[in-house]
């Protein structure tokens, strides 16, 4: 049966009008539950131009011809979920990939759609039910908040699979999710709430504990501004970064400009305290205390229970994202529009103890995706790859370590879950990419091999480039393993490293 399916899929992939399927334009007449298809047209190879959006537009010059389907989903009377499904006109690999959002969503993820189609995938993305990058859509619209929380992704997945089946004459043999940040949260929510939607999920730097994450984010701003003189201007970040590396870089036995495991380093920024006049090379006493707060977890002052982990040594060059002149709007929006429902809410008034409790009570697991019970997903033979940059300055990487640990504990231990979930921590990488570490890697191929061939990823080769040229490769290892130098050969070549359990500090 599998051979017959593969032959049919191969035949369909060789034709711009799929065998057994339908033409692109006729998809506009397709009737699906609470779905209005608003457009279906063929886009020539390299001919797609993304609508104006947030940030620079990616290039689509090398994207092959595809059928672009646009639709609006209305699972509730107040829903207005926009989706796009991109279907390769030829060369379909028989698979489906849904791609995630960032921040508060509000826009189609065109770049990831193009990346998926380049690989032969039929792909889908949603704006999560609203337009724009703030959470103002949620004020007075609980159904739209539900769409953002989980419903838009699930409904997009259901509609996309139906559209794929109509176009090609066959549904996808494998379905994958690929997202980072909010997209990581969306992926974990799918695994927890709709365990049969996907065969494999990639969840990078997930914002899955959003209520606590945003308490922490505002607390970072508090640390910078609560006391006179606490604010650390960006011109001081390089000095802190350098001092952190001097304290941490060689702890893994190799001084290579990377901190393999920052949790083993107990860097104290007091070493930078100004001895004479203030300068970009030192920190004043209030700034030392502020920096200490950034590295430390936010805890409940009464119980001592951790609310959210702190930043790690190595993240300093990206501190401006949360530790700037004002609290990050993506975080304050949670309290302005969801918790207090008051556009006039002042972030300076945040109390981590009481506001965390209030946010948790308000959310009730709607947005947060912290349920460690993934048994239904694993029973479906689902595979989950998580990854997170150790130098992420926007979502503390300890959050991914904590969630991974909670799943392992719930499911009977890490040894029992290694066949279903693996976490890859990336030294020197920032939020979803960038940074001084090996920040380019192919998680999709690793997941495909795991799901389709039952070959679990023992390591994933990552690279770092300078001016377009690869200057270092390094294996990423399943947590808690780290890349260990074999003792000979270039430290810039992955072949000279092996994945090993870290030794005791």
Predicted regions and their residues:
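A catalytic-pocket lid/entrance helix-loop region that shapes and gates access to the active site
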Residues: 145, 189-191, 196-299, 425
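Cap/lid segment of the alpha/beta-hydrolase catalytic domain
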Residues: 93, 101-172, 215-216, 223-226, ...
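Glycine-rich nucleophile elbow surrounding the catalytic serine of serine-hydrolase chemistry
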Residues: 179-189
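Short beta-strand/loop motif that positions the catalytic acidic residue
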Residues: 386-388
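Alpha/beta-hydrolase fold nucleophile elbow
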Residues: 170-181
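Conserved alpha/beta-hydrolase "acid-adjacent" motif
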Residues: 394-398
């Amino acid at each position: 049966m599998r051979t017959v399916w593969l032959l049919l899929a191969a035949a369909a992939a060789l034709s711009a009008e799929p065998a057994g399927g339908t033409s692109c334009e006729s998809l506009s007449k397709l009737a699906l539950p609470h779905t209005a298809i608003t457009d279906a047209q063929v886009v020539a190879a390299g001919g797609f131009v993304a609508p104006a959006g947030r940030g620079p537009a990616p290039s689509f010059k090398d994207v092959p011809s595809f059928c672009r389907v646009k639709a609006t989903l209305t699972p509730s009377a107040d829903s207005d979920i926009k989706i796009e499904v991109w279907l390769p006109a030829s060369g379909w690999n028989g698979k489906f990939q849904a791609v995630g959002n960032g921040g508060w969503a509000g826009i189609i993820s065109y770049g990831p759609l193009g990346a998926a189609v380049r690989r032969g995938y039929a792909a889908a993305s949603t704006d999560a039910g609203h337009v724009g990058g703030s959470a103002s859509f949620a004020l007075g619209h609980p159904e739209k908040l539900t769409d953002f929380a989980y419903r838009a992704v699930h409904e997009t997945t259901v509609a996309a699979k139906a559209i794929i089946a109509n176009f090609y004459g066959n549904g996808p043999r494998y379905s994958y999710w690929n997202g980072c940040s909010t997209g990581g949260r969306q992926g974990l929510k799918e695994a927890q709430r709709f365990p049969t939607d996907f065969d494999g999920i990639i969840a990078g730097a997930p914002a899955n504990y959003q209520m606590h994450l945003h308490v922490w984010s505002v607390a970072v701003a508090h640390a910078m501004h609560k006391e006179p003189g606490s604010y650390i201007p960006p011109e001081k970040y390089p000095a802190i970064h350098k001092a952190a590396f001097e304290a941490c870089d060689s702890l893994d036995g190799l001084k290579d400009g990377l901190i393999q495991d920052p949790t083993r380093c107990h860097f104290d920024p007091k070493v930078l305290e100004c001895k004479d006049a203030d300068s970009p090379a030192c920190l004043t006493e209030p700034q030392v205390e502020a920096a200490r707060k950034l590295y430390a977890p936010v805890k409940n002052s009464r119980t001592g229970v951790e609310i959210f982990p702190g930043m790690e040594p190595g993240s300093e060059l990206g501190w401006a994202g949360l530790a700037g002149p004002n609290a990050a709007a993506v975080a304050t929006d949670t309290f302005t529009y969801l918790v207090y429902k008051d556009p006039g809410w002042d972030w300076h008034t945040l109390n981590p103890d009481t506001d965390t409790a209030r946010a948790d009570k308000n959310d009730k697991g709607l947005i947060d995706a912290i349920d460690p019970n993934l048994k239904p997903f694993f029973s479906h033979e689902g595979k989950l790859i998580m990854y997170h940059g150790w130098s992420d300055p926007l979502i503390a990487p300890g959050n991914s370590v904590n969630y991974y640990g909670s799943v392992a504990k719930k499911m009977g231990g890490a040894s029992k879950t290694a066949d279903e979930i693996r976490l890859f921590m990336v030294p020197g990488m920032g939020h979803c990419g960038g940074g001084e570490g090996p920040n380019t890697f192919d998680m999709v191929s690793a997941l495909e091999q795991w799901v389709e061939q039952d070959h679990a990823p023992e390591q994933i080769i990552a690279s770092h480039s300078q001016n377009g040229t690869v200057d270092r490769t390094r294996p990423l290892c399943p947590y808690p393993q780290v890349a260990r130098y074999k003792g000979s050969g270039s430290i810039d070549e992955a072949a000279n490293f092996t994945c090993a359990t870290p030794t005791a500090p």
